[in-house]
Regions:
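Short glycine-/aliphatic-rich beta-strand segments at the starts of folded cytosolic domains
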Residues: 1-20, 86-99, 184-194
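Acidic, low-complexity central loop/insert segments
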Residues: 2-7, 49-140, 238
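Residue-level signal for inorganic ion chemistry
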Residues: 10, 62, 172, 209
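Acidic, proline/glycine-enriched N-terminal capping motif
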Residues: 1-46, 54-55
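Glycine-rich, small/acidic residue-mixed loop/short-helix segments
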Residues: 155-162, 177-249
Length: 249
C-alpha cells in the first residue's frame, strides 16, 4: 500500500479545502479527518486522510494512495485559482500499526480497529493483517473497491466518518445529499461469507442466474463485494464458491 503524503499550505488552505472535500475541515482541530474529493456528478475521484501539519503555519497533510496523488494534485491545482495555497509532496512516509501508539502517532479516523498512523522519514507497519481488518470492518480501498464509477455513500463513507451532511457546499454535494435523503441505496459495499475459493473480480451470480455483483478484497472465508441488494437475498455463486451476504456496508 504505497501512500504519498502531500502538504497543502498557505493562508487560504482551510477555506479552500472546505469548499472541495466531503468532510468538515473544522473537525481537524480534534484530530485526523477522512474525506474524499468528487466530480461535479458526485462520483469518486480520490479519498484521503487529513491531519494538521507540524508547525504553526496552518498547513495540512494529505495522506493519499500514491496512484491517485498526481490526479489529486492536478485537481487541487485546477481549483485553487488565485487562492493563497501551495501544494507539494512533503517527502514524509507512512508508518501504521495496531499496538500501543508511538509518540506522534494519530488514530485512523475511519475505524478504531485500524489503529494508528504516523508520518516520518521511514515507511512501515507492525505486521498487522490490514487486509483482514479492512475486510472485517468494510473499509474500501482505492483501485479495488473504489473506482471512478463509485458513489461514496454506496461505499460506506458515512459509516467510516468520511462525509458531513451539515457542512456547506462542496463539489458533488448535491448528488451526495440527494442519495442520502431521497433514495434507498439499491447497490453498495457488503461483507460476505465465502465457502470455497474465488478470486477478486469474480462476478457473483444469484439463485436465478442473474448477475448480483462482484467480489473484491478476499481474506480467508470473508470478502468485500459490491452487490445489488435485491439479488443478494440468498446464496450466490462466485465460480465454484458459494457466497452469502453477511452485512451491508
Amino acid at each position: 500500500m504505497a501512500r504519498t503524503i502531500l502538504t497543502v499550505s498557505g493562508s487560504d488552505t482551510i477555506g479552500f479545502l472546505q469548499g472541495l472535500i466531503t468532510n468538515d475541515m473544522a473537525k481537524l482541530a480534534q484530530g485526523p479527518v477522512y474525506a474524499a474529493i468528487l466530480t461535479p456528478q458526485g462520483k469518486y475521484l480520490a479519498d484521503f486522510i487529513l491531519s494538521a501539519a507540524p508547525g504553526a503555519d496552518g498547513g495540512v497533510l494529505v495522506d493519499v494512495d500514491s496512484s491517485l496523488a498526481p490526479l489529486l494534485v492536478q485537481r487541487l491545482s485546477m481549483y485553487k485559482l488565485r487562492a493563497d495555497v501551495q501544494i507539494a509532496d512533503s517527502g514524509l512516509q507512512l508508518q501504521r500499526g495496531k499496538g500501543p501508539a508511538p509518540q506522534g502517532a494519530l488514530p485512523d479516523p475511519r475505524h478504531p480497529a485500524l489503529g494508528w498512523r504516523r508520518y516520518g522519514p521511514e515507511a512501515g507497519d507492525d505486521g498487522s493483517d490490514f487486509l483482514a481488518l479492512r475486510v472485517a470492518h468494510m473499509v474500501p480501498e482505492t483501485g479495488i473497491e473504489l473506482g471512478p464509477d463509485s458513489y461514496i455513500l454506496e461505499m460506506g463513507f458515512e459509516r467510516l466518518n468520511g462525509v458531513d451532511f451539515r457542512k456547506g457546499c462542496y463539489v458533488g454535494q448535491e448528488v451526495t445529499a440527494r442519495m442520502k435523503h431521497k433514495t434507498e441505496l439499491k447497490k453498495g459495499l457488503a461483507l460476505v461469507a465465502l465457502e470455497g475459493t474465488a478470486q477478486p473480480g469474480t462476478v457473483l451470480i444469484d439463485e436465478n442466474g442473474k448477475e448480483a455483483g462482484q467480489l473484491h478484497s478476499v481474506s480467508g472465508n470473508r470478502a468485500l463485494a459490491y452487490l445489488r441488494f435485491d439479488r443478494a437475498t440468498g446464496p450466490m455463486q462466485a465460480g465454484s464458491a458459494t457466497v452469502q451476504l453477511l452485512e451491508r456496508g
